[in-house]
Structures are given as structure tokens and as C-alpha cells.
Design a protein with these regions (language model features):
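Metal-coordinating catalytic core of metallo-dependent amide/deamination hydrolases
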Residues: 2-110
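Active-site-adjacent C-terminal substructures of enzyme catalytic domains
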Residues: 99-129
């Protein structure tokens, strides 16, 4: 396909419709397809994916030295529910699993703490709003 503009596709790994194997297959296949097409590792959101899949995705990101993208802190409820599950914010939790070692970013990022912002700055993460 020759479209003449750059396209970036981010993965949406989750507990329901995809697997680590599919994520890796998409990453390898699409990043070889055309120089103007890039595939970035990603998952839907902290609340739609298991810690086991997140840990696997962090290993995949390390293998490819690749950034990871996700929906992050879109609503106050999302952040509060993450605090109940993991005793911290989505950003801190995901960073603790090694997901941002090679950069990446979050979509929305509306309800961020000072610590979240520090992590975004330190890891050079992007906020896509």
C-alpha cells in the first residue's frame, strides 16, 4: 500500500481479544511492511488486562527495545479503581512492571498525580489527548 503519509498503529492487547503472540506477530509483520507504516506495542488499559499479560508485554518491549502505549488515567473512577486494586495510580503501577523502560505514552492522561507526571517526564513518555 502506498498512501504517501506516515501511519502509526498501536496494539490493543487485552484479556478478551488478543494475545502476546498476536502482538509480537503484528509488531514484526507491520514494521516490515512499508517504511511509512509503524506498529507500536500497546494494550487497551490497566483495567482490561492481567498483570501476567502486562509482564509479558514488558518483556516483549525489552526484547525489541520498543515503546509501549495505552489509555491512561482517563477518568477519576479509573484511577480510584486502580488504587483499590494495586494501591497506586495506573502510571505508577505500569511503570513498576517495566512497561515504560523504552518510552511510550498514554492516551487521555486527564487525572494524573505529581508522581505520574514525574514518571512521564523521567521516561520521556508522550501524553496523547
Amino acid at each position: 500500500m502506498d498512501c504517501g503519509f506516515c501511519t502509526v498503529i498501536a496494539g490493543a492487547l487485552n484479556n478478551f481479544t488478543s494475545s502476546l503472540e498476536e502482538e509480537e506477530e503484528n509488531y514484526e509483520k507491520m514494521n516490515r511492511y512499508h517504511p511509512l507504516i509503524r506498529y507500536q506495542l500497546g494494550f487497551h488499559a490497566e483495567y482490561t488486562i492481567s498483570e501476567e499479560l502486562l509482564t509479558g508485554l514488558a518483556k516483549l518491549a525489552a526484547r525489541y527495545r520498543a515503546p509501549v502505549y495505552t489509555h491512561n488515567s482517563e477518568t477519576a473512577r479509573e484511577v480510584e479503581e486502580c488504587r483499590l486494586r494495586h494501591k497506586t495510580t495506573p502510571t505508577v503501577y505500569l511503570d513498576s512492571l517495566g512497561l515504560f523502560e523504552y518510552g511510550g505514552g498514554g492516551y487521555h492522561c486527564v487525572h494524573m498525580s505529581r508522581e505520574d507526571l514525574r514518571i512521564f517526564q523521567e521516561k520521556k513518555l508522550y501524553a496523547v489527548t
